[in-house]
C-alpha cells in the first residue's frame, strides 16, 4: 500500500474508532466521576465499594467469572491434550462437535437448562429426588451454563498453544527419564500457559460481564444486572456508571496483562527448527478410551441445546417434574413466527447485522491493509486500537452509547429536528447505536480474518501489478481481494451471526418494541406467563440453527485459523 493511501486510511479509521468507540467509552466512565455541578468527584466510585448491594454484585460477578474460567479450563484441557497427543478415527468429527456449544447463546440455553436441572426438572424426575441442582440463588447454574458455552474458546486456545510447542523439549525430558505426568507438569503446562491465559482472559471477561444468563436464571445480585436495572431508572443515577468503570477496569486490566504475557511469545527451542508433534495412532479399545472424554463432554455441553429443543416442542404446561414432555406440539414455532414482535425482530436483526457486517468489512479491510501492507510508524497503534473492543464488555459499550445518545439528543439543534432526533435518540430509534455497537464489537474478527489472508498473500503480486501499470484500485479489485475472499467471507459470516445473537447491547439499547432485535424479543417472550418460555425456545432454536450454519461455513473457509479469532 502506497504511503499517501495508507495515511488516508489510517486517519479515517482512527477518526471512526475515536468517535464510535473511544468517545462513548469516555462518556460511560466520565458520568461516574462528575457531580451534579460539573465538578470531578470520586464520591460515586467510593460509594460503589461502600454500598453493600453493589459490593455484593461485584463480588458475585468475580466469583462467577473465576468459577466459569476454572470450570471451562477443566472441561477443555483433557480433550485438547488428547487431541494433540493421539490420532484416531473420528478425531476430526469430535473436534468439530466440541465447537457446537458456541451455536447457542448462554442466556437461551438457560431456558432448557432449567427444564433439565431445575428443582422440578427432568433429572429430579428421573432420580426421584427434589434437589436444587442449580444451587441456591442459581449462581452454580450460571457458572455451569456459561462454562458449557464458553469452554470451546479455551479449547481453541489450548490446542493452538499445544501445537506450537516444540516436541523436542518433551522428547529430551523423556530421554532423561521423566514420567508422563512430570513432563506435563514441568514442561508442557508452563509452555502452554500463555495460551491458557489468553483463552482464560476472554472467558473471564465474557462471564464477568454477561447479562442475559443471570437475567434468565433470575440471579440478579451481579454487577451486570445491577447496571442494567439502574440504567432503566429515570433520573440519571451516576452510580451505575461508576460501577461500569470498575467492570471496565477489571476487563481492560486483564486484557492488557494477557497481551503483556502472551504477545509475541513462541514455544520453540532457541537455535533449532521446531518440528510438528507426531501423534500416536490408536485403534480399537485404546481409541475408544481416548474418545470417551470427548463424548462425555459433548453430551454434557449439549444438555442446554436438547432442553431448548424439547421445550420448543412442548405444549404449555406439558413438561413439569417429568423426564420427558408429556404433551408435544409444533404450534410454538408457528406462534413464534406469527407473534406480533417476532417477525419485526427477525427483520430488525437482519438489517442491523447486515449494516454491521458492511461496517466491519469496510474498516476491517482498511485496518488490515495498513497494518500488514504499509510501513507507517504508528500502524501498531491502529491494530491495537482495533483489537481493544475484545477487552470492552458489551454492557460497558452499551452504557457509553446511552450516554452519547443522551448528550446528542439534548442538543437544541437535535431537539428541534425530528430527523436528527430519530437518528440520535436511542429511545426514539436505536438503529445507529445498535449498528455501531455490533460493528465495533465484531471489528476484531474482521481485522484478524483480513490480516490472516493478507499475510498468506505475497505482496510481490501487488508490486508486479503496479510495475505493469495497474492502479492500486485495480490491483486491489483484481488481485488482492479475490485471493483473500475466503477469509473475508468467514469474518463477515462470524460478524453477521454473532451480531444477530448479541445480548447485552440489544437488551440495553433497544427500548421500543418495534426496534427489538431477536435476543431482546426472546427475553421479552420469556417473561410472558404461560406460553412465554415455549415460544422463546422456538425462536431460540431458529437462532441456534442460523448460527450453526454460519459457524460451519466459517470453519470450512478458515480451517484451523478459526481459533485465532477467539484469542487476545
Question: Which residue stretches match the model-derived regions?
Answer:
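C-terminal transmembrane helix and the adjacent membrane-cytosol boundary/short C-terminal tail
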Residues: 3-10, 90-91, 152, 159-174, ...
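N-terminal signal-anchor/first transmembrane alpha helix
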Residues: 1-27, 92-98, 247-257, 278-307, ...
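Transmembrane alpha-helices
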Residues: 12-15, 70, 100, 144-166, ...
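C-terminal structured domain segments across diverse proteins
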Residues: 177, 304-308, 321-326, 330-568
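Interhelical loop and adjacent transmembrane-helix boundary motif
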Residues: 2-5, 45-53, 137, 208, ...
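Transmembrane alpha-helix signature in integral membrane proteins
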Residues: 52-83, 247-261, 339-373
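Membrane-interfacial helix termini and adjacent extracytoplasmic/periplasmic loops
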Residues: 42-46, 55, 90-93, 110-147, ...
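Cytoplasmic-entry segments and transmembrane alpha-helices of multi-pass inner-membrane transporters
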Residues: 7, 82-113, 170, 184-185, ...
Amino acid at each position: 500500500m502506497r504511503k499517501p493511501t495508507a495515511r488516508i486510511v489510517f486517519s479515517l479509521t482512527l477518526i471512526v474508532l475515536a468517535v464510535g468507540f473511544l468517545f462513548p467509552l469516555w462518556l460511560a466512565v466520565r458520568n461516574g466521576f462528575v457531580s451534579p455541578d460539573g465538578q470531578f468527584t470520586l464520591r460515586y466510585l467510593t460509594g460503589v465499594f461502600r454500598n453493600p448491594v453493589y459490593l455484593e454484585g461485584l463480588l458475585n460477578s468475580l466469583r462467577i467469572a473465576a468459577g466459569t474460567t476454572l470450570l471451562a479450563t477443566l472441561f477443555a484441557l483433557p480433550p485438547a491434550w488428547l487431541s494433540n497427543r493421539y490420532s484416531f478415527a473420528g478425531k476430526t468429527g469430535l473436534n468439530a462437535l466440541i465447537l457446537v456449544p458456541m451455536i447457542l447463546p448462554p442466556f437461551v440455553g438457560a431456558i432448557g437448562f432449567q427444564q433439565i436441572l431445575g428443582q422440578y426438572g427432568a433429572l429430579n424426575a428421573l432420580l426421584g429426588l427434589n434437589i436444587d441442582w442449580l444451587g441456591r440463588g442459581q449462581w452454580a447454574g450460571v457458572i455451569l451454563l456459561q462454562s458449557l458455552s464458553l469452554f470451546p474458546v479455551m479449547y481453541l486456545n489450548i490446542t493452538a498453544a499445544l501445537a506450537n510447542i516444540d516436541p523436542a523439549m518433551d522428547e529430551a525430558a523423556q530421554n532423561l527419564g521423566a514420567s508422563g505426568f512430570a513432563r506435563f507438569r514441568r514442561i508442557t503446562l508452563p509452555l502452554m500457559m500463555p495460551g491458557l491465559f489468553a483463552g482464560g482472559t476472554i472467558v473471564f471477561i465474557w462471564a464477568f460481564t454477561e447479562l442475559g444468563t443471570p437475567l434468565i436464571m433470575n440471579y440478579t445480585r451481579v454487577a451486570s444486572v445491577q447496571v442494567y436495572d439502574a440504567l432503566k431508572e429515570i433520573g440519571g443515577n451516576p452510580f451505575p456508571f461508576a460501577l461500569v468503570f470498575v467492570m471496565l477496569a477489571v476487563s481492560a486490566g486483564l486484557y492488557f496483562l494477557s497481551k503483556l504475557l502472551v504477545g509475541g511469545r513462541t514455544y520453540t527451542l532457541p537455535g533449532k527448527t521446531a518440528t510438528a508433534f507426531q501423534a500416536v495412532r490408536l485403534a480399537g479399545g485404546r481409541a475408544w478410551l481416548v474418545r470417551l472424554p470427548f463424548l462425555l463432554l459433548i453430551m454434557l455441553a449439549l444438555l442446554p441445546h436438547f432442553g431448548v429443543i424439547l421445550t420448543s416442542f412442548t405444549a404449555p404446561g406439558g413438561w413439569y417434574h417429568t423426564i420427558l414432555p408429556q404433551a408435544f406440539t409444533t404450534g410454538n414455532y408457528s406462534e413464534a413466527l406469527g407473534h406480533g414482535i417476532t417477525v419485526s425482530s427477525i427483520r430488525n436483526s437482519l438489517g442491523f447485522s447486515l449494516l454491521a457486517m458492511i461496517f466491519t468489512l469496510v474498516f476491517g479491510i482498511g485496518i488490515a491493509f495498513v497494518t500488514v501492507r504499509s510501513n507507517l510508524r504508528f500502524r501498531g497503534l491502529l491494530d491495537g486500537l482495533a483489537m481493544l473492543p475484545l477487552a470492552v464488555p458489551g454492557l460497558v459499550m452499551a452504557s457509553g452509547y446511552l450516554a452519547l445518545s443522551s448528550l446528542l439528543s439534548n442538543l437544541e439543534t437535535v431537539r428541534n429536528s425530528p430527523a436528527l432526533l430519530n437518528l440520535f435518540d436511542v429511545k426514539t430509534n436505536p438503529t445507529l447505536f445498535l449498528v455501531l455497537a455490533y460493528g465495533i464489537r465484531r471489528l476484531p474478527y474482521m481485522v484478524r480474518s483480513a490480516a490472516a489472508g493478507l499475510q498468506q498473500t505475497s505482496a510481490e503480486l501487488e508490486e508486479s501489478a503496479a510495475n505493469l501499470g495497474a492502479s492500486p484500485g485495480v490491483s486491489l479489485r483484481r488481485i488482492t481481494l479475490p485471493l483473500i475472499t475466503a477469509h473475508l467471507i468467514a469474518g463477515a459470516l462470524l460478524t453477521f451471526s454473532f451480531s444477530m445473537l448479541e445480548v447485552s447491547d440489544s437488551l440495553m439499547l433497544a427500548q421500543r418494541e418495534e426496534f427489538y432485535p431477536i435476543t431482546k424479543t426472546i427475553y421479552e417472550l420469556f417473561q410472558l406467563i404461560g406460553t412465554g418460555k415455549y415460544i422463546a425456545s422456538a425462536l431460540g432454536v431458529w437462532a441456534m440453527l442460523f448460527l450453526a450454519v454460519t459457524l460451519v461455513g466459517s470453519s470450512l473457509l478458515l480451517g484451523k485459523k478459526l481459533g485465532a479469532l477467539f484469542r487476545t
